[in-house]
Amino acid sequence: VNFQEILKTATSERKLIRAIAYVIKSSNTEEESFFEALDKQGFEVKMKDLQIFMSGVKKADWDVGIAIDAIKMADKLDVVILVTGDGDFAPLITYLQENKGCLVEVIAFGKTTSSKLRELADDFCDLDGNPRYLMSQGKEKMHFFKKSTLKRK
């Protein structure tokens, strides 16, 4: 995924306040260059170690951290953009819209995005079938699908 292109399109003509990449660090040394690339592209990189339990189960969960950060920053933001298709973020979207007056946009691969997330988001951008947002550069534009407009109180 070409995160620089996603960031460029997501911010469009808006002022970027913060772009945070939530990453999981494993023992793979190759990921360091990926994390450095995200940093150079303007992302603040927040990192957690991959947890490996005695049973062999691996867990890497940023859901609560992402939700806390979004809620802490919401009073200073008009728009929150989530790049995820995970339906676990549906309550966060509702909270940001109803309690903080934020517009919430979701950018994700449509085929794997929760239908509830798509329904709740003020705008949804489907990355499926758009080569511009893959590492091979294409020339197509990302399209947001407008659903509704919320005004700040």
What does each model-identified segment do?
Residues 1-153:
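Terminal and domain-boundary accessory regions
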